[in-house]
């Protein structure tokens, strides 16, 4: 009974400390937003330190034209790991293809609109790897619980980012439609004015011609 009473607070202490570390690590991470002018290319770089490293890579086009871009990942040896064409968003879990610098390039080859792209680069890690020296069952249970919480938080974050990107794209579509409707209305007004003036001139010409004939 005494052992159970002592272990229970220890479990919660480990859980709280691990959760705080997880939240602190997550709060230090933030997505990067870049602007891609028409027919331009921007690249980001990331150094893999060990063979066991893995990187979560994601991007989504927030605004601009048809929201389509090209994306490719290049390994340190120069080989292309993946290449995507005309994509609006995507996610990858990149395992190490060798230690060195990885290149992530984004190209805007479709349309003439400036496109805003939000990019996420986040190193994947497990809390159990960081605490291999701790063999305590309470620590293992706490780490597993925090890992589950962290996975759920990541899912929620990705879902929210996706919904936010959809909102941005919908807003951009609405603004583009409003602009087109405005110009279409102006064009219709000009056409109506030209037709009205032409009708007046035609009627005036016909009546003027008849009066001359009668005279």
Swiss-Prot record:
Query: So where does this one cross the membrane?
Result: 183-203
List, alphabetically, the SUPFAM superfamilies matched: Supernatant protein factor (SPF), C-terminal domain (SSF101576)
> Does the keyword section mention Transport?
yes
Recorded hits in PANTHER family, A to Z, give: TRANSMEMBRANE EMP24 DOMAIN-CONTAINING PROTEIN (PTHR22811)
Q: Which keywords does this Swiss-Prot/TrEMBL entry list?
A: Endoplasmic reticulum, ER-Golgi transport, Membrane, Protein transport, Signal, Transmembrane, Transmembrane helix, Transport
What family is reported? Belongs to the EMP24/GP25L family.
Name of the protein this chain belongs to: Protein ERP2
The secretion signal range is: 1-25
Q: Set out the biological process GO terms recorded for this chain's protein.
A: endoplasmic reticulum to Golgi vesicle-mediated transport; Golgi organization; intracellular protein transport; protein retention in ER lumen; vesicle budding from membrane
The note filed under miscellaneous reads:
Present with 26300 molecules/cell in log phase SD medium.
Segments on the Cytoplasmic face: 204-215
Q: What membrane topology does the annotation report for this chain?
A: Single-pass type I membrane protein
SMART domains membership: EMP24_GP25L (SM01190)
Question: Where does this polypeptide localize?
Answer: Endoplasmic reticulum membrane
Assembly information from the UniProt record: Associates with EMP24, ERV25 and ERP1.
Record function comment = Involved in vesicular protein trafficking.
Instruction: Identify the residues that the record assigns to the GOLD domain, covering every copy.
Output: 41-123
Which regions of this chain are Lumenal-facing, per the record's topological domains? 26-182
What InterPro entries does its record include? Emp24-like, GOLD_dom, GOLD_dom_sf
Gene Ontology cellular component terms for the protein in this record: COPII-coated ER to Golgi transport vesicle; endoplasmic reticulum; endoplasmic reticulum membrane; endoplasmic reticulum-Golgi intermediate compartment; Golgi apparatus; Golgi-associated vesicle
Its taxonomic path starts at: Eukaryota, Fungi, Dikarya, Ascomycota, Saccharomycotina
């Amino acid at each position: 009974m005494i052992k159970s009473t002592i272990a229970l607070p220890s479990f919660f202490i480990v859980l709280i400390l691990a959760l705080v570390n997880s939240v602190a690590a997550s709060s230090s991470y933030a997505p990067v937003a870049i602007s891609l002018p028409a027919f331009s290319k921007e690249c980001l770089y990331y150094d893999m330190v060990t063979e066991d490293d893995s990187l979560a890579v994601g991007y989504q086009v927030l605004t601009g034209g048809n929201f389509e871009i090209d994306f490719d990942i290049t390994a340190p040896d120069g080989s292309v790991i993946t290449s995507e064409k005309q994509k609006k968003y995507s996610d990858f879990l990149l395992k190490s293809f060798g230690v060195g610098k990885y290149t992530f390039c984004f190209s805007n080859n479709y349309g003439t609109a400036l496109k805003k792209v939000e990019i996420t680069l986040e190193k994947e890690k497990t809390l159990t790897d960081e605490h291999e020296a701790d063999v305590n069952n309470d620590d293992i249970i706490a780490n597993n619980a925090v890992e589950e919480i962290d996975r759920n938080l990541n899912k929620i974050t990705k879902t929210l980012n996706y919904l936010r990107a959809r909102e941005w794209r919908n807003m951009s579509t609405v603004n583009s439609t409003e602009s087109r409707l405005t110009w279409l209305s102006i064009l219709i007004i000009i056409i109506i004015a030209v037709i009205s003036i032409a009708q007046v001139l035609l009627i005036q010409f016909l009546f003027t011609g008849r009066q001359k004939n009668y005279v």
